Amino acid sequence: MKLDLKILDARMRDYLPAYATAGSAGLDLRACLDAPLTLKPGDTALVPTGLAIHLADPNYAALILPRSGLGHKHGIVLGNLVGLIDSDYQGQLMVSTWNRGQTEFVLNPFERLAQLVIVPVVQAQFNIVDDFAQSERGAGGFGSTGRH
């Protein structure tokens, strides 16, 4: 898949999104910062990437996801948990960054912060019904199928 990428900050030419390995699903996104950003516990910040994408094809969307190491080791996750980039969006990719940890975290310029995953999209059409066909689960949820 070819994807249109617009470089909004010339410094990002040296830090284009890339797959870390041949088997990686996510492209690493970096913080396009002029100086280190300190996030105290509980702080949030909207961090620019210096990049914009245009998927153009309504059969695709992009997800911005946290990097597992930052979340597990430092408590750095996405403030919105998952960022959804629609196919017609053309603005800068921003990363809502939240320090849910117990200590300050310093995010350095051009540090890998999140990952971008391209996913297929199915746009549903609703069929209005009065009742559903019976299923084994029915309306059971929130642990109704058991714990183990």
Curated annotation (Swiss-Prot):
InterPro entries: dUTPase (IPR008181), dUTPase-like (IPR029054), dUTPase-like_sf (IPR036157), dUTPase_trimeric (IPR033704). It catalyses: dUTP + H2O = dUMP + diphosphate + H(+). Pfam families: dUTPase. It comes from the Bacteria. The keyword tRNA processing does not apply. Disulfide bonds: none annotated. The keyword Metal-binding applies. Pathway: Pyrimidine metabolism; dUMP biosynthesis; dUMP from dCTP (dUTP route): step 2/2. Substrate binds at residues 67-69, 80, 84-86, 94. Its cofactor is Mg(2+). Its EC number is 3.6.1.23. GO terms for biological process: dUMP biosynthetic process; dUTP catabolic process. Belongs to the dUTPase family. NCBIfam families: dut, PRK00601.1. This enzyme is involved in nucleotide metabolism: it produces dUMP, the immediate precursor of thymidine nucleotides and it decreases the intracellular concentration of dUTP so that uracil cannot be incorporated into DNA. PANTHER family: DEOXYURIDINE 5'-TRIPHOSPHATE NUCLEOTIDOHYDROLASE. This is Deoxyuridine 5'-triphosphate nucleotidohydrolase. It comes from Burkholderia multivorans (strain ATCC 17616 / 249).
